[in-house]
Amino acid sequence: MEAVVNSDVFLTSNAGLKSSYTNQTLSLVDEDHIHTSDKSLSCSVCNSLSQIVDDDFISAGARNQRTKPKRAGNNQSQQPIKKDCMVSIDEVASTHDWSTRLRNDGNAIAKYLTTNKYDTSQFTIQDMLNIMNKLNIVRTNRNELFQLLTHVKSTLNNASVSVKCTHPLVLIHSRASPRIGDQLKELDKIYSPSNHHILLSTTRFQSMHFTDMSSSQDLSFIYRKPETNYYIHPILMALFGIKLPALENAYVHGDTYSLIQQLYEFRKVKSYNYMLLVNRLTEDNPIVITGVSDLISTEIQRANMHTMIRKAIMNIIMGIFYCNDDDAVDPHLMKIIHTGCSQVMTDEEQILASILSIVGFRPTLVSVARPINGISYDMKLQAAPYIVVNPMKMITTSDSPISINSKDIYSMAFDGNSGRVVFAPPNIGYGRCSGVTHIDPLGTNVMGSAVHSPVIVNGAMMFYVERRQNKNMFGGECYTGFRSLIDDTPIDVSPEIMLNGIMYRLKSAVCYKLGDQFFDCGSSDIFLKGHYTILFTENGPWMYDLSVFNPGARNARLMRALKNQYKKLSMDSDDGFYEWLNGDGSVFAASKQQMLMNHVANFDDDLLTMEEAMSMISRHCCILIYAQDYDQYISARHITELF
């Protein structure tokens, strides 16, 4: 296929305003079973509810919250609704002040489309810009196009947020079955109002005063208790050990359970749930959970997992990195089936995709070529939760490595074999791979055409690097015991990316653990032994390494902690370290060793230099997370409202 060189390809790409969401694989509600907090061998939802009942988030007495009386719906709302109808959510949703004007602009554009009978199946960004000029809508921030397009997509019916009635949240709001009310009444008994309110308030209060793990450096980090075997997964640490724009709004400020309550009871959807609501209503594909056969049960399990992850976030900020068997969220995440991806995922991609899908988080909008009828292609805007990088399908040399930087970031393609957006710079031969539809949308002068960037990002941009070999021949390590071979092809990872005039910094990275190469230079192991996370905090790169099960790793960790302590005493000098260790530092070394034997560490123990961190990330990274500074992300929205 001949490559298309078109500097305006982003503006002329199909925006996909018509929702392709369909949920025909599951029934509406289980007519024969109501989920309770009783443990059951045959119902995974009941088991997860029983764990929520056992949780105690309160260390002191608290007055129970009184639930507000429900507004009775009319008789028509109790009748089944046709699948093709649209339902208005505008009257039940409120917004933050900074999003009100953006929402009104989206409503005006949607009204113009319906009044003039536009063909929304061929709608492009250029069409939206033309309409904005006619309506005198001025949006100077290019990244606002991401959310403005989302609002237009979800407001095409009577200028109000709307989706097809097959969406489970809309079915809950319209009370499509009396059994939905019976199930939610049981949930009200299970979710203690006081406990759940305390959990929400605690995590939101923590968020106000949290930047990254350096904010908790006055605490001792506890990695394990004698009676526990589970721990906070490194991917959870990468996502929530540092405050990420947009994801923080959806996961910490938003809450799936209270959103379901507000929709069913015809109450105003609170402003903190609004972005969660919009993310969910505009998702492209539903998720299916193994062992759950109906839509309402899927939403309940989704709310349960959101609550479990919220508790994990609370523990992360408090320096508690272990968890009981009942609190482990990893097994639940592995049971999610992603209907939009047509191939088996690795464990890391499965966990990352599952965490993001619970709140419908898709922060990247990319212009890609989508095949049509197998003989041609059409340019379409594709929302993606993360971008896939596959070194094993790329032809690289020492002069032309895989580079993730401000220049190559504009090269994306669509992999028709898996249904994912992939990172495909034209100089590495990815375009010749089967299933990948590749074009060069910006021509030869990439930086000169940055104003027509085919990528816009809402706060954060994530990359998943496929390094596992033979991943389609075996299942995950946690179920088969097979150890994958890891491709350690070095990647030139830039600490900063300039995208659309906004600086995105590398905030965190998840890496494969193949041994302790940094401390044992003779190690040549290529087998996967686990994962670790590197967070780029205000005090420098910090490593989250679960080394409590390996004596060699514990010794390496002790040496790192001792060197960090000596550098603080000697003004970052390494000279005389071993003399200090045998002399004045012997008492500190003994106390630090005792702490690590008890699985307790301090923040300063695991600090790295920037050179060490980038060297480890280059060869072993599997997840990279770039993001704006959170304060700049929020303040930009408030400043926009002033104009």
UniProtKB/Swiss-Prot annotation:
It comes from the Viruses. InterPro entries: P4B. Pfam families: Pox_P4B (PF03292). The keyword GTP-binding does not apply. The keyword Ribonucleoprotein does not apply. One of its GO terms (cellular component) is virion component. Residues 1-61 form a propeptide. The 73-kDa precursor is cleaved to a mature protein of 60 kDa during virion maturation. Proteolytic cleavage of major core proteins OPG129, OPG136, and OPG098, which occurs at a late stage of core formation, is required for production of infectious mature virions (MV). Its main location: virion. It is found in: Virion. Keywords: Virion. Major component of the virion core that undergoes proteolytic processing during the immature virion (IV) to mature virion (MV) transition. Essential for the formation of a structurally normal core. This is Major core protein OPG129. The lineage of its organism: Viruses, Varidnaviria, Bamfordvirae, Nucleocytoviricota, Pokkesviricetes. The gene is OPG129.
